[in-house]
A protein has these predicted regions:
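Gly/Ser/Thr/Pro-enriched helix-cap/hinge segments flanking short amphipathic alpha-helices
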Residues: 17-23, 28-32, 42-48, 431-449, ...
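Hydrophobic beta-strand segments that make up the repeating blades of beta-propeller
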Residues: 70-77, 121-128, 185-189, 250, ...
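Bacterial Sec-dependent N-terminal signal peptides
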Residues: 1-22
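Short, conserved, GDST-rich strand-edge loop motifs in beta-rich repeat architectures
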Residues: 127-135, 188-208, 314-340, 400-437, ...
Length: 718
């Protein structure tokens, strides 16, 4: 017995020793010097009852603000001030918020980085929301004035430059939409209302919505003019995710907005600098219902931008039963009748594909197939190569400070509204909300397997700490060749994850860096038979901005066959046989205007036939609600359209056709004519009650003629 125990002990030690090291290591605040915690007090004057996004948290931006070659950390705070931490090397940071002039007293949300005056020094644009007073909701543009003892000093010039937007703003993005050489500004907004956010009301598409986003055109001198309506930005939404990229590969950058609640997402296709058109229904068949953060990146190395949008579907059956709201068939019909596209409460991963014609793009949604559809109450998705193997992995921040999505709590609050006034209800609900436990969840990370699927590797890679995490961003903070992570948590000290890929793995990397105010649009790296592409925009995930140093993992390959750096002005710098393990500086003098080849139409196996003489059949199915009578059905059994069968019914050697009718609709035979086209003949037998559910043409009696076999049934009644 003792020998057996000893053997088991030795085996367990051997197994423990053989376990690979974690990819990420969570650093202690004492080690990094970063003590920031985005705290909210849940007071009587401002809380979830009078601000719908009270628990949505803040963002983080990573950028080299003082030009020392190390990315610094800027956190946004809600009821606490934003904080700036300068990177002192070796993953240690120093709080210089006061010296930098970045202390805030407003409810700050998203943050992005730009160089608004083209002086080569990064500036910060910070969105605000929360407070009912519009004066406290003016967005901030912190323009860098000087370096003082190595500390960047900023001044808020939002009002002077015309971008002090006083809406409820979540995030913003700078990009040159019209290719005139300066950065324009998209500001993503939401409204603040508790009721009716999931009611299928008539869409507001003429700029009249309180939650309409805003677009500011750069006048060329660093000042901006709001021109949303003129440019077609006219549809309401509750924007939580914002991504910029050339979605349809026409050379012009587009805008994707993921919207919360019933509001459909928006895909603003750039009309060659003249404005924008929302074409999401033409590109995607369905979307996430509660669209949170989003990211645009190429997940399968085909040089096409794919899209991830996260939602709040729990992983477990227990979690889903506690959280998922009721969506009745009648409400689903109302939503469809009001013009809303199909939406589902889960993460969606939209895989880009070429359309049939040149310039066309379509998306196939593969979230469930890829294994990333359910990650619970999620916020910020980031697609990046964290293990340097040449494939972009997926990190998702998770958690919500009060579990107000619990169905029992929702039923309780609904009952309160039935019997009390709004004021009485609010007084009673505030203490009840404070009693609700925090939905502290581990953040999730998935390894890209390279076959359109992802492995959940949170435990294996060391991402296991439960938290209420919101904004997150990546950067190589210690310049060792792998991407570290910074996470802004609610009512908890922020996370800094050190990436250990350079120490624990043998994969190579390559980095590309902007040269002062030269703006990169995208970079393509060809290595080992694969082509990777990264869009250079910093706004990713949720309320956050990543480093402007573009990172590629090369796996086992010690060099890249070629590197193509496309600048914002359209010129391309090409490099060949580039050694790994280095950071390339952009050299605009080497960039040349590319010859843009016209895309050839894809040769398809089939072509559409616009009309065939004699085939004018119109199927009719009476509306019927299956779920009203059978609520546990997995899908409708009615409304499935006509049955079709082909075969030679008249012995002339040509295939004829039979189309089965709906309930009380007779089927029709179409006989093919030698000269082309068809002639219709009614079915000369009395059909039984019900709908024709199947049909087959075959020689039943061996006389050489096609016979018609029909089945009847249906789910409609009476």
């Amino acid at each position: 017995m003792i020998k057996r125990i000893a053997t088991l002990y030795i085996c367990s030690l051997a197994c423990a020793c053989s376990q690979p090291d974690k990819l990420f290591r969570l650093l202690e605040a004492e080690q990094t010097g970063v003590q920031f915690a985005n705290t909210v007090s849940e007071g009587d004057s401002l809380n979830i009852l009078n601000y719908v996004y009270y628990y949505n948290g803040g963002g983080v931006a990573l950028a080299d603000l003082n030009g020392d070659g190390l990315d610094d950390i800027f956190f946004t705070g809600n009821e606490t001030s934003c904080r700036l931490y300068l990177n002192e090397g070796s993953l240690h940071f120093r709080d210089v918020t006061r010296e930098a002039g970045l202390e805030t007293r407003d409810w700050c949300t998203g943050v992005t980085v730009t160089d608004v005056n083209s002086d080569g020094r990064p500036d910060l644009y910070v969105c605000t929301a929360g407070y009912p007073d519009p004066e406290r909701r003016k967005n901030k543009l912190f323009v860098q004035q000087e370096l003082r003892d190595g500390i960047p000093v900023f001044s808020d010039e939002a009002t002077a430059r015309g971008v002090a937007d006083s809406s409820y703003s979540t995030q913003a993005a700078f990009f040159d939409f019209d290719k005139d050489g300066d950065q324009d500004l998209y500001v993503m907004n939401h409204a603040n209302q508790r009721e009716s956010v999931n009611t299928p009301a008539t869409k507001k598409t003429h700029g009249e919505g309180a939650s309409n986003d805003h677009f500011y055109v750069n006048d060329g001198n660093g000042r901006f003019t709001e021109q949303s309506f003129r440019l077609g930005i006219n549809t309401e939404g509750y924007g939580l995710g914002l991504a910029i990229g050339d979605v349809n590969d026409d050379g012009w950058e587009d805008v994707y907005v993921s919207n919360d609640f019933i509001y459909n997402d928006l895909l603003w296709i750039n009309d060659h600098g003249k404005g924008f058109v929302n074409l999401i229904d033409s590109f995607m068949n369905h979307q996430s219902y509660n669209g949170m953060g989003c990211d645009l990146a190429d997940i399968n190395n085909d040089s096409r931008l794919d899209l991830i949008v996260v939602d709040m579907l729990p992983e477990t059956a227990e979690g889903r039963k506690k959280m998922i709201g009721d969506l009745t068939w009648s409400k689903a019909e109302l939503i469809e009748q009001a013009g809303y596209a199909p939406q589902y409460m889960r993460n969606t991963l939209q895989l880009a594909a070429y359309g049939r014609n040149p310039g066309e793009t379509t998306f196939c949604e593969i979230g469930q197939m890829a294994g990333i559809a359910a990650t619970d109450w999620s916020w910020g998705p980031l697609l990046a190569d964290f293990d340097n193997d040449g494939w972009k992995d997926l990190f998702i921040s998770n958690g919500y400070y009060r579990d107000i999505g619990d169905k029992d709590f929702i039923d309780y609050t609904n009952n309160l509204f039935m019997f009390r006034s709004r004021e009485e209800t609010d007084r009673q609900m505030i203490p009840e909300i404070r009693k609700q436990k925090a939905r502290r969840l581990p953040n999730r990370i998935f390894r890209n397997k390279g076959d359109l699927s992802f492995d959940p590797v949170s435990y294996q890679w060391g991402i296991t700490q439960p938290s209420c995490s919101n904004g997150t961003a990546y950067s190589d903070l210690d310049n060792d060749g792998d991407l570290d992570l910074v996470v802004n948590n609610l009512n908890e000290t922020s996370f800094i994850y050190e990436n250990l890929a350079n120490k624990n793995l043998n994969n190579n990397y390559l980095k590309i860096k902007n040269n002062n105010n030269i703006s990169i649009s995208r970079v393509r790296v060809h290595a080992g038979g694969h082509t990777q592409e990264v869009v250079a925009h910093r706004e990713r995930g949720f309320m956050s901005a990543v480093s402007d140093v573009i990172h590629f993992g090369l796996g086992e390959f010690a060099r890249a066959d070629s590197v193509e750096i496309t600048l914002a002005n359209g010129k391309v710098q090409k490099l060949y046989q580039v050694a790994s393990g280095q950071t390339i500086q952009v050299n605009p003098a080497e960039a040349k205007t590319p010859v843009r080849l016209e895309k050839e139409a894809i040769q398809t196996w089939f072509s559409a036939v616009k009309a065939i003489t004699g085939l004018e059949y119109v199927h009719h199915d009476d509306p019927f609600s299956d779920f009203q009578y059978q609520p546990l059905l997995p899908h409708r059994l009615t409304g499935q359209g006509p049955v079709l069968a082909t075969g030679d019914l008249d012995g002339d050697g040509l295939d004829d056709c039979f189309a089965g009718g709906g309930k009380a609709q007779p089927g029709i035979i179409y006989l093919q004519k030698p000269e082309g086209g068809f002639v219709s003949r009614p079915l000369e037998v009395k059909a039984p009650e019900g709908k024709c559910t199947d049909a087959c043409i075959f020689d039943a009696n061996g006389d050489g003629l096609g016979d018609l076999y029909l089945t009847f049934g249906g789910n409609e009644w009476p």
